[in-house]
Amino acid sequence: MQDKFIKKRHILEYEDKQLINVKLGITTREDGLSPYPHNAFNMARYIDDSQQNITKHQEMLATVIGFPREQWVFPIQTHENKVVKVTSNDKGTNIDALNDALHGVDALYTYEPNLLLTMCYADCVPIYFYSEKNHFIGLAHAGWRGTVGQIVNALISNIDFDLNDLNVVIGPATSTSYEINDDIKSKFETLPIDINQYIDTRGTDRHGIDLKRANALLLENAGVPKDNIYITNYATSEDLSLFFSYRVEKGNTGRMLAFIGQ
């Protein structure tokens, strides 16, 4: 079955017949102006890159997806589980330059139109939430810390409609080649889901983990119907021609931008 993330210029766009007024996807590393190592489509202002490159990439993306930069919102992510509701007053936050607005925020949601929620990724899991019926969109950033902190639950706790009307898309992230040690594994053991469904022990102090699967299980446990959750097969750590991977490239890499707008 074909993946619902469809490759287009600069992006992978999620396509589904249920989507009418919502657009969501993630940028790729292709056809840009940045190093990492060359011609990369980096979207992060907080790494070693020309600010002019980022602005140009934003302008290119705005043209592709039909959301002007003035409608974008970008938080300063810190691998925590803080969730913030955004409104039209937040338009343009951290787009032209970074400031302290929305600092320490790893999930956003809104019920308002003409907003594009955005965050940067390079292995962590982008998790998109939407309900066309309720004019709701959300976006979460879940690395291992955010997963342990149950950021998906933190976002869902703000929803005031029936979860049967919520759809969740789990986007490109690191593959099951990602490994954690005993100490980190012990943190996952505190979660209310079956650890054997997403962690496998591979040796002394070595455990493979499927972060996409872990977040899907947390969503199900929180009451989101399994049929309403989609998990892409794309893996950032397995295709460096398409994605940046912080772990594989040992931190010397760019960032993709996940986005969802209505």
From Swiss-Prot:
GO terms for molecular function: adenosine deaminase activity; copper ion binding; oxidoreductase activity; S-methyl-5-thioadenosine phosphorylase activity. It comes from the Bacteria. Zn(2+) binds at H79, C124, H141. It catalyses: adenosine + phosphate = alpha-D-ribose 1-phosphate + adenine; S-methyl-5'-thioadenosine + phosphate = 5-(methylsulfanyl)-alpha-D-ribose 1-phosphate + adenine; inosine + phosphate = alpha-D-ribose 1-phosphate + hypoxanthine; adenosine + H2O + H(+) = inosine + NH4(+). Its EC number is 2.4.2.1, 3.5.4.4, 2.4.2.28. Its cofactor is Cu(2+); Zn(2+). Keywords: Copper, Hydrolase, Metal-binding, Oxidoreductase, Transferase, Zinc. It holds the Pfam family Cu-oxidase_4. Purine nucleoside enzyme that catalyzes the phosphorolysis of adenosine and inosine nucleosides, yielding D-ribose 1-phosphate and the respective free bases, adenine and hypoxanthine. Also catalyzes the phosphorolysis of S-methyl-5'-thioadenosine into adenine and S-methyl-5-thio-alpha-D-ribose 1-phosphate. Also has adenosine deaminase activity. Homodimer. Belongs to the purine nucleoside phosphorylase YfiH/LACC1 family. NCBIfam families: peptidoglycan editing factor PgeF (TIGR00726). This is Purine nucleoside phosphorylase SSP1584. It comes from Staphylococcus saprophyticus subsp. saprophyticus (strain ATCC 15305 / DSM 20229 / NCIMB 8711 / NCTC 7292 / S-41).
